[in-house]
Amino acid sequence: MPQLDTSTWFTTILATITTLFILFQLKISKYIYPSSPELKSMKSLKHNTPWETKWTKIYSPLSLPLQ
């Protein structure tokens, strides 16, 4: 059986890791980050829903009269 030549593995792995690192750096550098992030007020996020203003009753099957 022939011997497996592993002499180029180090170079291949090193080149792959370097290439991936450069690609990820280029990808991350294209993002635009806000200069000063601010909290949004919670009052502007409140939605009016129809069931908040009126009273509703939920009937569970056990509370219904027996037939």
From Swiss-Prot:
Underlying gene: MT-ATP8
Modified residues (N6-succinyllysine): K54
Any one GO BP annotation for this protein: proton motive force-driven ATP synthesis
Membrane topology field: Single-pass membrane protein
A GO molecular function held by the record: proton transmembrane transporter activity
InterPro entries assigned to the protein according to its UniProt record, in alphabetical order: ATP8_mammal, ATP8_metazoa
Predominant location category: mitochondrion
Protein name stated in the entry: ATP synthase F(0) complex subunit 8
Subunit structure comment from the entry: Component of the ATP synthase complex composed at least of ATP5F1A/subunit alpha, ATP5F1B/subunit beta, ATP5MC1/subunit c (homooctomer), MT-ATP6/subunit a, MT-ATP8/subunit 8, ATP5ME/subunit e, ATP5MF/subunit f, ATP5MG/subunit g, ATP5MK/subunit k, ATP5MJ/subunit j, ATP5F1C/subunit gamma, ATP5F1D/subunit delta, ATP5F1E/subunit epsilon, ATP5PF/subunit F6, ATP5PB/subunit b, ATP5PD/subunit d, ATP5PO/subunit OSCP.
Originating organism: Talpa europaea (European mole)
Localization: Mitochondrion membrane
Transmembrane segment boundaries: 8-24
Keywords: Acetylation, ATP synthesis, CF(0), Hydrogen ion transport, Ion transport, Membrane, Mitochondrion, Transmembrane, Transmembrane helix, Transport
The keyword Transmembrane is assigned to this record: yes
Primary role: Subunit 8, of the mitochondrial membrane ATP synthase complex (F(1)F(0) ATP synthase or Complex V) that produces ATP from ADP in the presence of a proton gradient across the membrane which is generated by electron transport complexes of the respiratory chain. ATP synthase complex consist of a soluble F(1) head domain - the catalytic core - and a membrane F(1) domain - the membrane proton channel. These two domains are linked by a central stalk rotating inside the F(1) region and a stationary peripheral stalk.
